[in-house]
């Protein structure tokens, strides 16, 4: 097995070691041009290292700028909450819920047990209607033309 040899391996191996990853053996100048994917670097050709060519580069730059602005705004919002709080010693979690103040003042919450409760007419909130109507409201019916006043009994022609 030690005597096995692949034909053509030596020239290929030698050429790949001499060429290197960045430069190839082609010369560039006025007459000779570099192959596709390579550019002229002095006397020899170098590989082009453009990661995002053309309009894709502009899109990537704009996307990264907008992403960084969003990150900065999020950090500013987190630290701005810390500035509003009066306790600088307590740790603050930016994702935690904020405690909202109670709407009812503490004076109205306390009730003395020795006093009698207020009358029922004072507890219920009554809307202000203005003057009391003197006429009864009109009758509610789907067919107002058939209303003839007070009807008693069954109004069915089958009877």
From Swiss-Prot:
Region described as Disordered: spans on this chain: 122-159
Membrane topology: Single-pass type I membrane protein
Position of the signal peptide: 1-26
Compartment annotation: Membrane
Extracellular topological segments: 27-57
GO cellular component, one term: membrane
Segments on the Cytoplasmic side according to the record's topology features: 79-159
Protein name per the record: Transmembrane protein 92
């Amino acid at each position: 097995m030690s005597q096995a040899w692949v034909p053509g391996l030596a020239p290929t191996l030698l050429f790949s070691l001499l060429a290197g990853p960045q430069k190839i053996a082609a010369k560039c100048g006025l007459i000779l041009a570099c192959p596709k994917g390579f550019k002229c670097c002095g006397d020899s050709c170098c590989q082009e290292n453009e990661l995002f060519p053309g309009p894709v580069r502009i899109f990537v730059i704009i996307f990264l700028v907008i992403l960084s602005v969003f990150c900065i705004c999020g950090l500013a919002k987190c630290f701005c909450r810390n500035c509003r709080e009066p306790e600088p010693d307590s740790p603050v979690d930016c994702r935690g819920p904020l405690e909202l103040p109670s709407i009812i003042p503490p004076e109205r919450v306390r009730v003395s047990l020795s006093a009698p409760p207020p009358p029922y007419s004072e507890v219920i909130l009554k809307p202000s209607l203005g003057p009391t109507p003197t006429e009864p409201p009109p009758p509610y019916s789907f067919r107002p033309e058939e209303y003839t006043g007070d009807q008693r009994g069954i109004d069915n022609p089958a009877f």
